[in-house]
Design a protein with these regions (language model features):
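Conserved NTP-donor binding/palm subdomain of two-metal-ion nucleotidyltransferases/polymerases, i.e.
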Residues: 1-19, 25-233
């Protein structure tokens, strides 16, 4: 997911470098993939007794910049605010995309949006995530079910964020594509754009933003469960 699948859409792939490579592995294949990585000289710091249940396991290779993360789920199941996002991606049949086995284009765009949304409510996001979303939407426009995408985003209160991401990509980053109904192309994106530019590359450039994200995450969780936020009483 993300990474090289997105960088290949940039005019120059080196403009979209990745610190790691994220691989989504079905639970039934996870340990086999783990063993294969060890066979190829990679190592992990995750204790052996945690491998069977860990959502994410990281691997490095001595003398190499290679950094791989295996994921059982796209969103950490230990985070109450985001765990329910995983249901969008169950029982998906992968397709081959430029030599990679990946989610179909519609689901991958949904993932890019929800992944960016997760970072936004946690601490903030960077312009690169808007580039990823815009370039993917433009490249696979005809393969996206735009009505269903809107319904999916709306069901988790992310439709306004997604519309703003599309508008920033098109109006400010020059990644032009048609935004069909029911998407709102006239949304005011200035507050989100300002927040993005103030947040640094990854959005978390100061402790104040990281602290305030605790309140935001709690509100997101409450909005999905119908509960009252427990941070502000």
């Amino acid at each position: 997911v993300k990474g090289q699948l997105c960088s290949r859409l940039y005019p120059q792939t080196d403009h979209r470098i990745s610190a790691d490579d994220d691989l989504l592995i079905p639970d039934g294949e996870f340990m086999a993939c783990h063993e294969q990585l060890l066979t190829n000289g990679l190592t992990t710091d995750t204790p052996a007794d945690e491998l069977a249940s860990a959502d994410e396991v990281s691997y490095t290779k001595k003398g190499s910049l290679l950094y791989i993360e295996l994921h059982r789920h796209l969103f950490d199941s230990s985070e109450d605010a985001h765990d329910d996002l995983n249901h969008f991606f169950t029982d998906i049949n992968p397709v081959e995309t430029d030599g990679f086995l990946a989610m179909p284009p519609h689901e991958h765009l949904l993932y890019l949006i929800l992944h960016a949304y997760k970072h936004f409510v946690r601490s903030g996001i960077g312009l690169r995530q808007f580039c990823d979303i815009g370039l993917w939407a433009r490249a696979y426009h005809v393969e996206i079910d735009w009505q269903r995408l809107h319904e999916q985003c709306e069901s988790v209160h992310a439709a306004t964020f997604a519309a703003a991401a599309f508008c920033i990509a098109g109006d400010y980053l020059g990644i032009e594509f048609d935004l069909p109904a029911p998407w709102d192309g006239s949304i005011d994106v200035e507050p989100l754009l300002h927040d993005t530019l103030c947040g640094g590359v990854y959005g978390s450039n100061d402790l104040t933003r990281l602290h305030s994200s605790t309140v935001t995450l709690n509100a997101v969780k409450a909005s999905r469960t119908g509960e009252k936020s427990s941070v502000l009483r």
